[in-house]
């Protein structure tokens, strides 16, 4: 409530007296110009009005100049933990938190004195931050700029790092080795980075790939110009050995990297192994380096805080990706047939390799699944073409799924190229006399004698050839039982061979009779050839008889064309 001051009361009394004087002087006509009181009263009233006007104006000015602003209050933001703690190689144990009222999430560094209050192990990385895991008891080391391996490269998606890969040598070309879940991520890859420099990625050709999480790899054909711009060199892939020391590399970018050390542990399956090297967020796909090269590629964790998992790229590139038909035996890997898979007591893992096909993996063996179906399996299919139908005794090909020419009737066009009526079904029986069987005419004795003489001449040449290396031995050795049996075995096939190679043919007629030998020529008998023993006395008598027959045959030459059944003597 407004309370006037004493000055206000004095002004009020003075203005009331001045108003009364002015009213008496000017209104009621009692004004005397010689008196000054009315003038003073009038001046008092004017000064009071002027003062009031000035006060109102000054109040208005002050009112306008006053600025009204909202009241300032203290805002309080509450953040809620939205993930399990994970270990960061730079900041230690970190938790992801989000504001209660909405907004961007932050990462909270946990005080080491509060680690024991966390519900789970602080040395883990769960699905929220990747498939990597730090190993309890292991440490991280800071890598100097340019001190990382020359083949290491980072895969970027904008300003975030999806993972790491390496340039490796494979069958005359350099390819980028990277996990499948990194290259085909929900966030598309945009660049390859190395030591603070990056090159945009394109739709490059893929040499081979596998989307199975247990065989998680991609081999990308990156142009040589990209490698040259990033100064990335290639390295070789080696087979892992149990207990080998391995080293991993990673970080939030390609310029500030960290590394971890561990050991490789072999498993029963040749395509995978475990290691104790620590990893962190964004390290997926980091190669496992040794002193001589790369022995594997990190793909995830097996036991949180204890071991990580890696794939054996040497087995994959040598057996599943390589185009070599044979494998070196020193590798210890064996390819088997698909039928042998069912004979094994252990299970096989079936995966599909892009640009290669399906393959079954079991321990240190693998078998390729053939493409398509076997011929025997195709016979059991129900999608075979429909056969023609029988309608009124005729085959109808209209509904059959086979190609045919409907304009040409079947079995009506002959080789002569003219239309011929089909044969009638009702044929007239015709009786005809049956010809008597023809009698076989025996071979003349002259032909038999001629063939026998030719055969004996061939056998004589053969015996002379066989007897030449035996002249150095005595008569006792010639008459031994072993030599007799040997000669019989050697002579018997020659006789059968001559008869089988030169079958008898009809002989042309001649104007003169053929006289080949004297009437004393013995008949055809296989006994001198294979059935009769050839002792020393028998050989001498047979040689004399053959010489006499040869002389007689030379004195009486055979006239006419020679018989094709008597071949020239064969040298053996």
From Swiss-Prot:
Biased composition (Basic residues): 544-555
Biased composition (Polar residues): 508-520
Enzyme Commission no: 3.4.21.-
TM spans (from-to): 7-27, 37-57, 77-94
Active site: 181, 216, 284
GO CC annotations on file: host cell membrane; membrane
InterPro entries: Peptidase_S1_PA, Peptidase_S1_PA_chymotrypsin, Peptidase_S39B_luteovirus
Domain Peptidase S39, residue spans: 135-330
MF term (GO), any: transferase activity
Pfam hit, one: Peptidase_S39
PTM note: The polyprotein is proteolytically cleaved into several chains by the viral protease.
Keywords noted in UniProt: Covalent protein-RNA linkage, Host membrane, Hydrolase, Membrane, Protease, Serine protease, Transferase, Transmembrane, Transmembrane helix
Gene Ontology biological process terms from the UniProt entry: proteolysis; viral translational frameshifting
Disordered: region residues: 498-572
Site residues (Cleavage), renumbered to this chain: 132-133, 325-326, 402-403, 499-500
Protein name as it appears in the record: Polyprotein P2A
Organism: Southern cowpea mosaic virus
């Amino acid at each position: 409530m407004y309370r006037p001051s004493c000055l206000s009361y004095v002004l009020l009394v003075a203005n009331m007296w001045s108003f009364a004087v002015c009213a008496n002087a000017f209104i009621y006509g009692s004004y005397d110009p010689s008196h000054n009181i009315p003038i003073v009263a009038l001046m008092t009233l004017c000064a009071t009005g002027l003062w009031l006007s000035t006060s109102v104006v000054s109040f208005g000015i002050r009112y306008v100049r006053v600025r009204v602003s909202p009241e300032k209050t203290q805002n309080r933001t509450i953040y809620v933990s939205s993930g399990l703690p994970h270990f960061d190689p730079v900041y230690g144990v970190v938790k992801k938190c989000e504001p209660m009222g909405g907004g961007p999430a932050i990462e909270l560094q946990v005080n080491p004195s509060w680690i024991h209050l966390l519900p789970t192990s602080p040395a883990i990385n769960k699905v929220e931050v990747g498939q990597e895991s730090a190993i309890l008891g292991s440490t991280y080391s800071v890598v100097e700029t340019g001190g990382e391996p020359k083949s290491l490269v980072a895969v970027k998606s904008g300003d975030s790092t999806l993972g790491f890969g390496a340039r490796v040598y494979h069958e005359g070309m350099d390819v980028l080795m990277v996990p499948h879940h990194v290259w085909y991520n929900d966030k598309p890859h945009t660049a390859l980075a190395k030591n603070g420099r990056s090159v945009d990625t394109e739709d490059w050709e893929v040499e081979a790939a596998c989307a199975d999480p247990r065989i998680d790899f991609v081999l990308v054909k990156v142009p040589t110009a990209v490698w040259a711009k990033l100064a990335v060199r290639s390295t070789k892939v080696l087979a892992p050995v149990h207990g080998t020391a391995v080293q991993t590399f990673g970080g939030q970018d390609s310029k500030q990297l960290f590394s971890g050390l561990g050991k490789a542990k072999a498993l029963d399956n040749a395509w995978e192994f475990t290691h104790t090297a620590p990893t962190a967020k964004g390290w997926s796909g980091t190669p496992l380096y040794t002193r001589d090269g790369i022995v594997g590629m990190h793909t995830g964790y097996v036991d949180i805080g204890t071991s990580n998992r890696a794939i054996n790229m040497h087995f994959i590139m040598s057996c599943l990706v390589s185009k070599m038909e044979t494998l070196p035996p020193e590798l210890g890997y064996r390819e088997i047939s698909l039928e042998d898979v069912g004979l094994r007591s252990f299970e096989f893992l079936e995966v599909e390799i892009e640009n290669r096909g399906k393959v079954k993996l079991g321990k240190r063996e693998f078998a390729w699944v053939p493409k398509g179906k076997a011929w025997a399996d195709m016979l059991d299919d129900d999608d075979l073409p429909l056969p023609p139908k029988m309608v009124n005794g005729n085959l109808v090909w209209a509904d059959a799924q086979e190609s045919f020419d409907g304009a040409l009737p079947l079995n009506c066009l002959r080789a002569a190229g003219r239309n011929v009526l089909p044969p009638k079904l009702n044929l007239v029986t015709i009786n005809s006399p049956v010809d008597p069987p023809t009698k076989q005419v025996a071979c003349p004795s002259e032909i038999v004698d001629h063939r026998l003489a030719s055969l004996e001449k061939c056998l004589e040449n053969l015996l002379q050839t066989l007897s030449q290396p035996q002249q150095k031995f005595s008569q006792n050795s010639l008459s031994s039982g072993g030599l007799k049996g040997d000669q019989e075995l050697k002579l018997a096939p020659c006789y059968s061979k001559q008869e089988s190679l030169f079958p008898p043919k009809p002989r042309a007629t001649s104007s003169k009779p053929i006289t080949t030998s004297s009437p004393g020529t013995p008949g055809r008998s296989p006994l001198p050839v294979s059935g009769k023993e050839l002792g020393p006395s028998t050989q001498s008598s047979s040689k004399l008889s053959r010489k006499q027959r040869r002389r007689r045959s030379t004195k009486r030459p055979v006239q006419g064309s020679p018989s094709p059944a008597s071949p020239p003597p064969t040298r053996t």
